Amino acid sequence: MAYTNNQLHVIYGDGSLGLQGANFHYLFSYERGGLESLVVNDKEWLYRTPTPMFWRATTDNDHGSGFSVKSAQWYAADKFSTCQDIELTVDDQPVTPLPIAPLNNKYTDHEIATKVSLAYHFVTTTVPSTIVTVTYTVTADGQINIATHYSGQSDLPELPAFGLRFIMPTTATGFDYTGLSGETYPDRLAGATHGQFHVDSLPVTPYLVPQECGMHMQTEQVTVTRSTTQNNADHDNTPFSLTFSQTDAPFAFSCLPYTAAELENATHMEELPLARRTVLSIYGAVRGVGGIDSWGTDVEAPYHILANQDIDFSFNIHF
């Protein structure tokens, strides 16, 4: 069908929902719990479905204060939290029940909409568990708004971080962002200046023992640029980009070639695997890194993330 700038082509699949426009194609999976494919101008941007994130690689200070042991539940939650409910809304009208096969048979190949939202509700593996909701809202121009809500729960340890992780198929050539200069953390903001910055490649701070690094606080926008894909038939090395921008408030982000788990597993830099992916982490909350000493002193109280408090953040994806 012919695409226009004011309509989405909606494809009701057996176990997924497709949204198409003139130069984009998004696939939302009911089984995998989120956005499974994000194609813009024939370039795929996702290697894995984005997932809620509760862990950042621990630091020497974390180990010294025992924080990594106290909050170990969040390490498992980062890996194993499951999506247990999905809500679909098309042009502000709820679609119930969820149109999986054979319920999708009533739809044609010519369904259109101006706005589609999918809310994925995740249950953490913590004891007690809590709920995280990730809501994707797509408009006809291809912009994706992502709103993430963490429901505060008493009797849980403090969080290392809370955010959403995007793993991209190939390594980025670099990224540009508007925010604070250099690496910054909630307790490491002094001396940073606000501006627009470019970072080549995906640098990892060369600590003797790999640990948390590369955070950028108070970010208004970050644009990731790649020049390669996993498509062996794609010989075009022209750079292409995707932008993540704030909505109501700035966010924090890191853009690395490794996940927090990969950094956590390595005890020396040479144990890290070859860089093959881009791991963009968008954070709504980040624990401080401390530094008073590395043999027992905790991060100062204002830089903790209490588990009993709600956390909300949102951002847009556009091209």
Curated annotation (Swiss-Prot):
Component of a beta-galactosidase that displays activity with the artificial chromogenic substrate o-nitrophenyl-beta-D-galactopyranoside (ONPG). It is an enzyme of class 3 (hydrolase). This is Beta-galactosidase small subunit. Keywords: Glycosidase, Hydrolase, Plasmid. It comes from Leuconostoc lactis. GO terms for molecular function: beta-galactosidase activity; carbohydrate binding. Its EC number is 3.2.1.23. It catalyses: Hydrolysis of terminal non-reducing beta-D-galactose residues in beta-D-galactosides. InterPro entries: B-gal_small/dom_5, Bact_Beta-galactosidase, Gal_mutarotase_sf_dom, GH-type_carb-bd.
